[in-house]
Regions:
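Conserved AdoMet/S-adenosylmethionine-binding subsite of the radical SAM
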Residues: 2-180
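C-terminal accessory extensions appended to soluble enzyme cores
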Residues: 164-221
Length: 221
């Protein structure tokens, strides 16, 4: 696997990969799935970071944080210098609906893992709040994580339906985010699915929703 990674880096080019934002693990499967060799993943991540290629990991799992080799890898003042770890970002999918994910770690366990990475290991972290299963639940997730996440990525539930969310709750939610983000270090990423959801609402509210979403995005320009 390491040889394949090295060959792919040479074939594509390190500069091209960096310009594209680095390597992302992974939308299609969980990189810390119990069936995956987490030690091999750690070595691949090291190879990428050693070449100054940013690495972003998205997972639902938390058990890998108890793996001794991963703990050594993340610990400050170990064989992995801080200047490598600055290019590492780790996020957790947190929707707040444990009943929809009976085989995954609970919301609280994921939040605790996020806190450990952010506060103890000083790793850049993010929350993938996608999909929003309910406005209330999404609001609670944000309240519990915005101080321990460097970013929160927000997306509407698929498929997009006009009656998916109450339009007044949806509007109140995005206005609250707009007002919150101005004073936070945590960056909020509004996914395109939020715009698609806003476009399903009727009347003048549609344009008000889109205007607020635009305001949030412009904060980070």
């Amino acid at each position: 696997a390491l040889e394949i990674v090295a060959k792919d880096i040479m074939r594509i080019g390190e500069d091209v990969i960096r310009e594209d934002g680095g390597i992302f693990f992974s939308f299609t499967c969980d990189p810390f799935d119990p069936d995956i060799d987490v030690d091999m993943l750690r070595m691949i991540v090291f190879v990428l970071l050693d070449r100054q290629i940013p690495v972003t990991i998205l997972t639902k799992n938390v058990d890998w944080l108890e793996n001794d080799k991963w703990k050594d890898f993340l610990e400050p003042d170990t064989d992995c210098p801080d200047n490598l770890l600055r290019d590492l970002t780790i996020g957790f999918t947190i929707t707040g609906k444990d009943k929809l994910e009976p085989n995954a770690p609970s919301t609280e366990k994921r939040i605790e893992a996020l806190r450990k990475l952010h506060d103890e290991y000083k790793i850049k972290t993010f929350v993938s709040l996608e999909p929003i299963t309910s406005i209330h639940t999404a609001s609670e997730v944000i309240k519990k994580t915005y101080e321990i996440a460097d970013g929160i990525r927000i997306g509407a539930q698929s498929p997009i339906k006009k009656d998916r969310y109450d339009p007044y709750e949806f509007f109140g939610f995005i206005v609250a985010i707009r007002n919150l983000v101005r004073d936070l270090d945590c960056r909020f990423m509004i996914k395109d699915s939020m715009y698609k959801q806003a476009e399903t609402f009727l009347g003048a509210y549609r344009y008000m929703y889109i205007e607020v979403l635009d305001e949030i995005r412009k904060i980070y320009e």
